[in-house]
UniProtKB/Swiss-Prot annotation:
Protein name: Ribosomal RNA small subunit methyltransferase C
Gene: rsmC
Organism, as annotated: Idiomarina loihiensis (strain ATCC BAA-735 / DSM 15497 / L2-TR)
Gene3D superfamilies: Vaccinia Virus protein VP39
Pfam families in the record: MTS, MTS_N
This protein's record includes keyword S-adenosyl-L-methionine: yes
CDD domains registered for this protein in UniProt: AdoMet_MTases (cd02440)
GO terms of molecular function: 16S rRNA (guanine(1207)-N(2))-methyltransferase activity; nucleic acid binding
Matches recorded under InterPro entries: DNA_methylase_N6_adenine_CS, Mtase_sm_N, rRNA_ssu_MeTfrase_C, RsmC/RlmG, SAM-dependent_MTases_sf, Small_mtfrase_dom
Amino acid sequence: MSAAILSMLGRQSAQPWANGSLLVIHPGGGELSALPNASAWSFHAGHAAYWKAAGRPVFCQIQPPNLSHYDGVLFLVAKEKELNQYLLEQLASLPTGTPVWFAGEKRSGIQPLMKHLPAWLQPPQKLASANHCLLFASERNEQVHQSASIEDYAKNITYELNQQQESFVTLPGVFSREHIDPATLLLLQHIKDLPKGRGMDFACGAGVIAKQLASVATELMACDVSPIAIAASEITLANEPVKTELRLADGIPDNAGQFDFIVSNPPFHTGQRTDYEIAREFISNARQHLNKQGVFRVVANRFLPWPEVIESVFGNCSVIADDGRYRVYHATCR
């Protein structure tokens, strides 16, 4: 969660969300775990870990916890519009009269979201505006509505790879929601020479890369920080001949074991900000999980400083593809 939102909430003379049992939706970090009687419904394993460390209840999963257990909800608006719509759908399960507070940065899209709240929520009232952030209040009314499931938001995306039609299933809040991204497509054109053996798709998203790795791997693990991504990958990989172990983790799982290759289109964004530490930590940890002569292969924007980082960690780094915007980097664990 941004410091601006936290500051806005902290400056309110009246903080009704601090009274009674509160569910914080999409917390974006652990800052609000200090609120009395607060629980979190999170979509990021790293953020969930902050709440666990603070000894607070946290649910890092697609489905909401039992909403009847809470006296109020604090909804932190996500930058992904469809994810917000899915989360709003789940609020239909709230008991009538339950207050809902919405907080978010203006650039996250909170204003248009407030203009189009579903009919089962009362028209929102603006409580505060500060530091380019907004705070609104609403509540569940008596209108009956059956919440849509996450499966109702699934999209089947098709694309062409090596003159073959391929597909994957994606869900709200997962990278590459509308189409395959060009960086991933470039990477997929350079995986057939990977060594046979146990492989990993790090930051697997909707399982696009893992699905293609199934043709070269004898055993496969795919991990992601998002439970929604794990659910999308599960659908995408359901009928593949090589069973993939899906892991929800912030980084490479500690007990992941050793691999013959690790492949990724690693993320470098946290919310709306660039965060290079995600990829730096991944590159460092990847070497520890590779067997001798194991292969490390990633795709990234050309402007990112990964060749130097990969070289410093592995002692070697080569470019095996470059389309002018993205490069595929290759290193061997020696």
